[in-house]
Structure formats: C-alpha cells, structure tokens
Amino acid sequence: MNGIRENAQEKKTTLVIGGTGKTGRRVGERLTARGLPIRIGSRSGEPPFNWEDQATWAPTLRNVWAVYLTYYPDLAVPGAVDAIRSFVELAMASGIRRLVLLSGRGEEEAQRAEQVLQDSGADWTILRCSWFSQNFSENYLRDPVVSGEVVLPAGNIGEPFVDADDIADVAVAALTEDRHAGQLYELTGPRLLTFAEAVGEIAKATGREISYVQVSPEEYASALAEADLPAEFVWLVNYLFTTVLDGRNAHLTDGVQRALGREPRDFADYARATAAAGVWNS
C-alpha cells in the first residue's frame, strides 16, 4: 500500500526547467515548501536536461505531470520555437497534463512559441513578462551597479519592471490550481520606469552615487564583444534593447492582479530589500 501511495506521489512531480535561474529557482522553492515533489531541469540536474541535446529530454519527463517551461537563453533566439515544439510534442506523448510557459512581451518569436502550447491539447498557462527587476541584481547588470556606472542603449522609454517573486507566485498558482488553465497573463510591475529612473531608485536605496549612461546599440554591442561575451548573448541583448524596448511595451497590465488577487511588487520595494541584503555591496 505504501508503495502505491509513493508511486502516486511520484506521478505528481513537476519538472522545473531552468530550475537554477531567476524564476525557476523561486518556483522550485515554493513548490518544495508546499511539500510537492519537483525535478530540476538543468545541465547539473539529475537526470541532466539540456535544450541542445534532445536525448536528455525524455528521462526528465518520466513520471512528471506538469512542467514549468523556460527556454535558455531566450525565446527570441533562432531555433527556439522548433525546440519548444519538439519538447511539447514529447511532453504530450509522455502524458504531461499541464504546461506553464515563461514568455516575453512584444517578442514575435515568443508569441509563436506560445501558440505551440495553445495548440497542444494540454492545460496551458502563459506568463508573458516584462523586464525582471532582478536583472539588476542576479544578472550581468549587477556588476555595473556595484561599480557605480550603468551603461546601456536604453533611452527615455518606460518599462514596467516586474519582480521575479511575482512571476514565481503566478507560476506556482498556474501549476497547482485548475482555474489558470487556458489563461495568458501579461505580468508587469505597477509603474513605468526608464532604465535611468530604475538606476536612480537603486542609488537611492543603496545611498550611493550610481550614474546612468546611454550609448548607441552599436557602441554597446562593441563593448560587450570586447568583454569576450558570447556572440549569441551580444545579439540577444542588442535585440531586446533595440526591438522590445521601442515603446511597444510601455504600458501596465493587470496580469498579477488577475492571477493572484493582489497588486504587483513595486520596483522601489525590490531595490530597498535588495540593498538591505547587501547584494550591491562592493
């Protein structure tokens, strides 16, 4: 009898792809705190998962019923939609019932990936997110903040930065509650901020001088290349700053409110908490 119960519980396992990333880590922590079994889908996971090696996919789907689906490095890169399609087909053939996709606002390729889920026959939920607040503290922008000068090709366009904790809360709700099936949530924060204003709020929270310098996309791409960053990363960042940040996403949405029944976390609250945790200390 115990074996039957254990097997039933194993079949409720949720696969968290990108489980060591900004949102995946938080999703995994929340599911674990609820006593729900998870499997981390990453190159260091057991079994390992690698988007570039389809042979690793099937073992991670064994005895899984739901998947939190993130694509690395981004759904905008060439080949992402084909990979998502192949994975979703395998997931459905493996008996997966629920798929929750992390997507991006204003990205045509991401919307094509969303359509794959919508056509899959699974209980799907799509989280179409604005820029993460945590990009300033858990990404390559942390070092510029610590150095006191943030250089980016972003002008006077407002962005409704969303907190990764809000994204994780919505993702967990979608993975564990039936009412989110078939929902597309656009997730934003409660305010529009330019990147210069966001850096200013971080400066205020830390009590330090942190300057913001705007450069051209060409200058920025050249600087990234000189820093020996991968060409794919340079292309992606330039794409996001020149295409996604062209004003198309400079508006607020009510996705967090609809999904969770509460307001999203403000960028200033994120900045204060992150500063207090010492993340930006030199």
What label would you give each PLM region?
Residues 211-277:
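Mobile cap/lid helix-loop segments that border enzyme active or cofactor-binding sites
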Residues 68-70:
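Periplasmic-binding protein-like
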Residues 281:
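Short arginine-rich
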Residues 2-39, 43, 49-55, 62-65, ...:
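Oxidoreductase cofactor-interface core, primarily capturing Rossmann-like NAD(P)-dependent enzymes
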